[in-house]
């Protein structure tokens, strides 16, 4: 798979910055990761090197532009070969998507561990949904 197109057609530094910012933030979408896994991008060494290159977004001078900080967590998870393989499953993509949703609701994202231990715990969806319903009733 040829991935040189990722950087080869970028005309200037401003455009490159915008393209790379958009790309790194797309990593916060589990369904996009599912697409990449199903289309074997994570088997391409050049693409994996590009993901490693994206680590510069953690630097203070760049992180301030990140709107979806979950993307940096996903970038960490993508270092784990098991996670890269597992995210191709629709059930896992849905689980990760649900956990992100509950994080946005203020319920807290399940802890995945380090890049070496990127296992996913089952979200407490039914319990969380009941809590959300009770909260709505009390408002």
From Swiss-Prot:
Location of region: Disordered: 115-139
Location of this chain's protein in the cell: Nucleus
InterPro entries associated with the record: Med31_sf, Mediator_Med31
Pfam family, one: Med31
Basic and acidic residues compositional bias, start-end: 128-139
Entry coiled-coil feature ranges: none
One Gene Ontology cellular component annotation held by this UniProt entry: nucleus
Gene Ontology BP term (one): regulation of transcription by RNA polymerase II
Keywords, sorted A to Z: Activator, Nucleus, Transcription, Transcription regulation
Recorded GO MF terms: transcription coactivator activity
Similarity annotation: Belongs to the Mediator complex subunit 31 family.
Task of the protein: Component of the Mediator complex, a coactivator involved in the regulated transcription of nearly all RNA polymerase II-dependent genes. Mediator functions as a bridge to convey information from gene-specific regulatory proteins to the basal RNA polymerase II transcription machinery. Mediator is recruited to promoters by direct interactions with regulatory proteins and serves as a scaffold for the assembly of a functional preinitiation complex with RNA polymerase II and the general transcription factors.
Quaternary data: Component of the Mediator complex.
Name of the protein: Mediator of RNA polymerase II transcription subunit 31
Organism: Schizosaccharomyces pombe (strain 972 / ATCC 24843) (Fission yeast)
Gene name of this polypeptide: med31
